[in-house]
Amino acid sequence: MAQYSLFTSESVSEGHPDKMADQISDAILDAILADDKNARVAVETMVKTGMAIVAGEVRTSTYIDLEDLIRDVILDIGYNSSDVGFDGASCAVLNAIGKQSADIAMGVDEANNKDLGAGDQGLMFGYATNETDVLMPAPIYYSHRLVEKQAELRKNGKLNWLRPDAKSQVTLRYDNGKPVAVDAVVLSTQHNPDVSQATIREAVMEEIIKTTLPAEWLHADTKYHINPTGQFIIGGPVGDCGLTGRKIIVDTYGGMARHGGGAFSGKDPSKVDRSAAYAGRYVAKNIVAAGLASRCEIQVSYAIGVAEPTSISVNTFGTGSIADSEISKLVAQHFDLRPRGIIEMLDLLRPIYRKTAAYGHFGREEPEFTWEKTDKVAALQG
């Protein structure tokens, strides 16, 4: 990986339409897993003016009141009135969920001592870097924190003119591979019509940007773009159609690591798009936490119905304290990257996924996020 002098990442709030869709899909997954941990779930959501549509494939023994669940998620995010353009209590809810293909189930399920096969073919990446305490790239980490702060101030009423939809973008200046300054910040937030742009700019600067970004990184030449197009009253699903899985770079490393292309939300852990990406993060984070490298990227790949990965690759970009080939041996020794091994290693058959669906799947040391633990450090250090 080349050394950047500038690097930019973005994030979006829980009220962004694509993130609404992700949260609905993961809320459905959670509700099913809470009662049927062996369910197969692949649920996609679309939200647009006045409606939420869910579709996909599910195999489960439980029953979920999807309409009430979907409405509750929308209302919880903050779309609770026609005044903000979308109301979870009155929007149409359309359900086009069907059964999982028997052909897929036959190839994936465990039976007659056959191990759980990967739910699909594909390639996944995990990444960690020591440029932040949580071993995440700084641009995406701080982009998440900005929109998370926007939501906090909206929900606690401190800035009661804020509305749910918001986006952030952070450009950091790097010196010798380490972030040293903020070059530019973009924050666009939906708002009520009766607040002035001057009030918005001052509040966003003082209450969001300055309380979130490290003061020592802000300087006289930092560029601030706060609602740069002017008013942002029309937002959420009225302003843009939202779809599950359309923020895969926001969900991961903000572009600083590669991405295999598979989205996460709405997928149960038999889908390696999700579970193997979580495992990749777990492996890479433990390697960096153990001091074996200052940056580490893991690639894994799978064939549908086959348990063993078709490949496992390690790249430390020349930062490793030992050879990448030696780190690869340690990975094989200490991490089981078969689908069943990942599920058991990270305890993934739990209703923990809606929480992942906004503000990043990685770099948040929540108790449910087992892939953020660094409990393999001692074993890796030998």
Curated annotation (Swiss-Prot):
Gene Ontology terms, MF aspect: ATP binding; magnesium ion binding; methionine adenosyltransferase activity
Catalytic activity: L-methionine + ATP + H2O = S-adenosyl-L-methionine + phosphate + diphosphate
Pfam families: S-AdoMet_synt_C, S-AdoMet_synt_M, S-AdoMet_synt_N
Chain segments carrying region Flexible loop: 100-110
Residues where L-methionine binds: E57, Q100, D240, K271
BP-aspect Gene Ontology terms: one-carbon metabolic process; S-adenosylmethionine biosynthetic process
Top-rank lineage group of the source organism: Bacteria
Cofactor binding mode and count: Binds 2 divalent ions per subunit. Binds 1 potassium ion per subunit.
Binding-site positions, ATP: H16, D165, A166, K167, D240, R246, K247, A263, K267
Pathway(s) annotated for this protein in UniProt: Amino-acid biosynthesis; S-adenosyl-L-methionine biosynthesis; S-adenosyl-L-methionine from L-methionine: step 1/1
Keywords, in A-Z order: ATP-binding, Cytoplasm, Magnesium, Metal-binding, Nucleotide-binding, One-carbon metabolism, Potassium, Transferase
Residues where Mg(2+) binds: D18
GO cellular component: cytoplasm
Compartment(s): Cytoplasm
Binding site for K(+): E44
EC number: 2.5.1.6
Cited InterPro entries: ADOMET_SYNTHASE_CS (IPR022631), S-AdoMet_synt_C (IPR022630), S-AdoMet_synt_central (IPR022629), S-AdoMet_synt_N (IPR022628), S-AdoMet_synthetase (IPR002133), S-AdoMet_synthetase_sfam (IPR022636)
Cofactor: Mg(2+); K(+)
PANTHER family, A to Z: S-ADENOSYLMETHIONINE SYNTHETASE
The protein's role, per its UniProt record: Catalyzes the formation of S-adenosylmethionine (AdoMet) from methionine and ATP. The overall synthetic reaction is composed of two sequential steps, AdoMet formation and the subsequent tripolyphosphate hydrolysis which occurs prior to release of AdoMet from the enzyme.
Family classification: Belongs to the AdoMet synthase family.
Record text on subunit structure and interactions: Homotetramer; dimer of dimers.
Name of this protein: S-adenosylmethionine synthase
Organism field: Saccharophagus degradans (strain 2-40 / ATCC 43961 / DSM 17024)
